[in-house]
Amino acid sequence: MAKPLSISSSDTQSQPLQWRAYYEMTKPKVVALMLLTVLVGMCLALPGAVPLQPLIFGLLGIGMMAGAAAAFNHLIDRRIDGLMARTYNRPLPKGRVSITKALTFSISLAVLGFVLLYTLVNELTAWLTFASLLGYAVVYTAYLKRATPQNIVVGGLAGAMPPLLGWTSVTGEFHGNALLLVIIIFAWTPPHFWALAIHRKAEYAKVDIPMLPVTHGTEFTKTCILLYTILLAIACLLPVLVGMCGPLYLVGSTLLSCGFIYKSWELKFDDKPGLAMQVFRFSIYHLMLLFIVLLVDHYLWV
């Protein structure tokens, strides 16, 4: 007599667990911060309200392609991810997602995002977002990351593009003010990642990734972080100098820059443990709050 069909608890849980693995591959927290800068780029491009179509489909399409870039990063880095304490639990090293499925997911997400931008936003934004995806997934992850200690500096341009993508989503054209926002994120990227690289120096050395602390030492990297935070503080003043922002942004960005410089100074000249991760975490709040202040100031200033 045939046994009645039954569904085990492991079977019922496998599907949601599978989707959580795909969701994790898109690096949702990173994409969320990136989409904040996209939104600010959209809002600063216009004096009034942002039209709903480019707002909704721009954020959706750019977010999908950013998630695809992150998934490609998981795919390309799966070997070294399995050897590093920070990343060994990711879906691919743990076998929660196969290589074939990860590749299919990444390509599908990228294609859907591109089609969405191309048809419902504009061609310029679609192609710029595609170029940013290639810059991060191919140029940075597949080549620069393993080739030079300046990987973050050179490859950081792809990660600095979101405000420009937001700007072009609602205007369909380049503008110098959008490039100022790109410069800010470009200057922010090295100290952000170098602080993490100091904390994870031994792991990067283990997998032969030539991060700056591995190739040039921790003290040299601390000096570079301090110098870049000063450069970032100068870059943050550029929107004020061109009349793009008002007094609220000037005060807010100055306070944030002083805080970042202080944390970097402390990292350089104090040997307390855990300072590198403090700088890394502060840098995330710095960028998030800076763009929120940009947004609030824009509507008050207008």
Swiss-Prot record:
Under Pfam families, the record lists: UbiA (PF01040)
Entry's InterPro entries? Protohaem_IX_farnesylTrfase, UbiA_prenyltransferase, UbiA_prenylTrfase_CS, UbiA_sf
Example GO CC term: the record gives: plasma membrane
Key words, A-Z: Cell inner membrane, Cell membrane, Heme biosynthesis, Membrane, Transferase, Transmembrane, Transmembrane helix
MF terms from GO for this chain are:
protoheme IX farnesyltransferase activity
Regions annotated as coiled coil? none
Which reactions appear under catalytic activity for this entry?
heme b + (2E,6E)-farnesyl diphosphate + H2O = Fe(II)-heme o + diphosphate
Task: Name the residues that span the membrane.
Answer: 30-50, 52-72, 102-122, 124-144, 152-172, 178-198, 224-244, 245-265, 282-302
The leader peptide range reads none
**Lineage top rank: taxon:** Bacteria
The task this protein performs is described as:
Converts heme B (protoheme IX) to heme O by substitution of the vinyl group on carbon 2 of heme B porphyrin ring with a hydroxyethyl farnesyl side group.
Q: What else is known?
A: Carbon 2 of the heme B porphyrin ring is defined according to the Fischer nomenclature.
**Family of the protein in this entry:** Belongs to the UbiA prenyltransferase family. Protoheme IX farnesyltransferase subfamily.
Q: What name does this protein carry?
A: Protoheme IX farnesyltransferase 1
Naturally occurring in which organism (per UniProt): Shewanella woodyi (strain ATCC 51908 / MS32)
What gene is this protein a product of? Answer: cyoE1
